[in-house]
Structure formats: C-alpha cells, structure tokens
C-alpha cells in the first residue's frame, strides 16, 4: 500500500485510526507513506516518524520539505525506515533509497522492498 502525502495532525489521525484495519482486511504486506508534510503541514520530526512506524507504516519517503525540521537529520542517518529524495547530493543526510526485508524474507524472490 502506498499512502500519498500525510499532512499534519489530520493526516496522522487517519493513518492512526485506519491503517491497521486496512492492512488486516486486505492482507497488505508493505506500507510505504510519504510523510514530508506530517509535522504541522511541512517536514517530519523523529517523534512523528516513530508514531508512523507504530501505526503500521513500514517505510517513509520524503520530498522537498525533507529538511524543514532539522531534528530529522539524525533519524535520516540512523533509520532504515526512511528515505529522502534520491536526487539530492550524495553528501545530504540519509539515503535516497532503502532496501528492506519483505514478508518472504530477504532470500526469497521478491522478498525485499
């Protein structure tokens, strides 16, 4: 499941209230969400990133507001569950791609996302 732009508290509330049910009902293996506007409508904080993971998001993508909240830089460097835009400089914090084990495990065909 790919979730478009999660915007502010209203967007986070919808994810918190509906995501786990959707994942169960539709047997979804992976949830990727764009969260570049999840913190007050612009940017992402480490705390909100952690909440999204608890709600059932597997991977967060970011966009042009990646660095709007400077406190996300440590999370970009440390977490395997967040990807910044790939077209930024290689010197920018974080990575523009992520490879994660999927439901079939890392050795099975298609077992990564």
Could you tell me what each predicted segment is?
Residues 1-113:
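Acidic, metal/ion-coordinating pockets
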